Amino acid sequence: MTHAHITSWLITVILFFIAVSLQRSGASKAKIVQMALRLFYIFTVITGGLLLHSIASISILYIIKAIVGLWLIGAMEMVLSGMKKGKNTNVAWIQWIVAFVLVLFLGFMLPLGFDLF
């Protein structure tokens, strides 16, 4: 399940940057990519929930990682909706960067992730 989750969030991040670039260029395909992105949000949340459920003794860090992961998805939506409305998205980008760094750090630090830290 770990590999499914990693694949899911990796595709989610790639689709997010594709959606951002399509949104900036004003392409008509941006809506289709955003719908695929939302589908991968669901895959990421489900696989993350299944991973969380499979842990025998849940540390508070796993709960924090899940919350930060949901925050990251929210920041992605804030960036995309702000761009669509033509608003300033600097705060949303800062939130996205902070959440992304935190979720990567927690994901690689905890025992279910890869041993980078």
UniProtKB/Swiss-Prot annotation:
Keyword vocabulary terms for this entry: Cell membrane, Membrane, Transmembrane, Transmembrane helix
Cellular compartment(s): Cell membrane
Transmembrane segments: 2-22, 32-52, 55-75, 97-117
Pfam families tied to this protein: DUF1516
GO cellular component: plasma membrane
Record's bilayer topology term: Multi-pass membrane protein
Transferase as UniProt keyword: no
Family stated for the protein in its record: Belongs to the UPF0344 family.
Name by which UniProt lists this protein: UPF0344 protein GWCH70_0687
